[in-house]
Amino acid sequence: MKPASMMLVLALLAGAAQADEPAASAPAPSNSVAAPNPFDTVKMPGGVEYREIAIGSGSSAYPGSTVLVQYTGWLQNPDGSRGSKFDSSRDSGLPMTFVLGEGKVIRGWEMGLQGMKVGGKRRLIIPSALAYGAKGSSSIPPNSNLIFDVELVGVQ
């Protein structure tokens, strides 16, 4: 037998031997969907976005409940990052207290605080229409989107 023919026969035999081995099983297709990460950013109807920083374990905030909130607020830069700080309850150490749902705070807070539990921390990204809008406020220019880090310290 010629060397080239011998090589061909050996190659065919080697391939046939490998074909007899069981093929590695492919993973079975899965219909399950990975659970969403509770720390992903969530966009609410109306445009408020929030991201859980820490999930609380106490009572939940709901309309009609008196909430105590520590917060820091920043203007949002055009690239989405935090801009200059305009207010913080942490500067005084006293939480802001109000009844959720009575319209005493900006609408973005009314929406973004609902469902939080005492001890929870969230970052809220609030479009200008749900903040101070075209009028702005003393330290907030008109049409500014805002970023707040909030901590729910109590519910009554």
Where are these regions (language model features)?
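Cross-family detector of peptidyl-prolyl cis-trans isomerase
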Residues: 2-156
